[in-house]
């Protein structure tokens, strides 16, 4: 008896399908938020696929499609509700934007940083090496004469840190950044630079 009264009260206290509040407020909000979530997941999934993170991408793909099926079912059930269309389209646009922001914040994978300097290439390479980056330097020839080309493969989340080091040496240096789709991560994991490695070796010798 108590349970029946409870359900009766809930029926009048919570908006149900057919109620204007449910049809024009709650349902569109649900569609919008679900669409934002599934499109954000989809954006990250595509980026993970390009970086060969297959397991994570497959798991995200499952969640993405599951949410999409739930949302599209509600849209089809309410074809006469224009607010559902607006929520669906708005959620798609917002989800794409949020997905790109999340991907930038997560900064998954590695990048190739290429620096071309006519005068300060050796100094830039030394500073990056001292900071713990693996650096390769080679001679090149530009339209205005000889240049030094500095390469380093690093985690994407450390690009800003590396660029501060580079621009402290040469603020207007020319550089380019490319995605490194596949790397030998054991080679490019964080490691001490030349200066720090020398200090570490001395400490170990003292302890011995």
UniProtKB/Swiss-Prot annotation:
InterPro entries: DUF2179, DUF5698, N-reg_PII/ATP_PRibTrfase_C, UPF0316. It comes from the Bacteria. It is found in: Cell membrane. Pfam families: DUF2179, DUF5698. It is a multi-pass membrane protein. The chain crosses the membrane at residues 56-76, 82-102. GO terms for cellular component: plasma membrane. This is UPF0316 protein LIC_12973. It comes from Leptospira interrogans serogroup Icterohaemorrhagiae serovar copenhageni (strain Fiocruz L1-130). The lineage of its organism: Bacteria, Pseudomonadati, Spirochaetota, Spirochaetia, Leptospirales.
């Amino acid at each position: 008896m108590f349970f029946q009264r409870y359900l009766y009260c809930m029926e009048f206290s919570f908006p149900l399908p057919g109620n204007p509040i449910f049809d024009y407020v709650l349902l569109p909000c649900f569609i919008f938020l679900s669409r934002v979530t599934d499109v954000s997941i989809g954006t990250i999934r595509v980026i993970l696929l390009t970086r060969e993170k297959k397991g994570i991408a497959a798991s995200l793909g499952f969640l993405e499609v599951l949410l999409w099926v739930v949302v599209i079912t509600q849209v089809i059930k309410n074809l006469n509700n224009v607010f559902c269309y607006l929520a669906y389209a708005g959620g798609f646009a917002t989800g794409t934007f949020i997905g790109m922001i999340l991907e930038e914040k997560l900064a998954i994978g590695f990048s190739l940083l290429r620096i071309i300097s006519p005068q300060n290439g050796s100094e830039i390479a030394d500073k990056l090496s001292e900071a713990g980056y693996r650096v390769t330097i080679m001679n090149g020839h530009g339209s205005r004469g000889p240049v030094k080309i500095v390469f380093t493969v690093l985690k994407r989340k450390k690009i800003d840190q590396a660029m501060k080091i580079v621009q402290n040496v040469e603020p207007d240096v020319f550089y380019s950044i490319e995605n490194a789709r596949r790397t030998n991560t054991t080679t490019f994991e964080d490691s001490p630079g030349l200066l720090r490695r020398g200090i570490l070796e001395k400490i170990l010798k003292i302890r011995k």
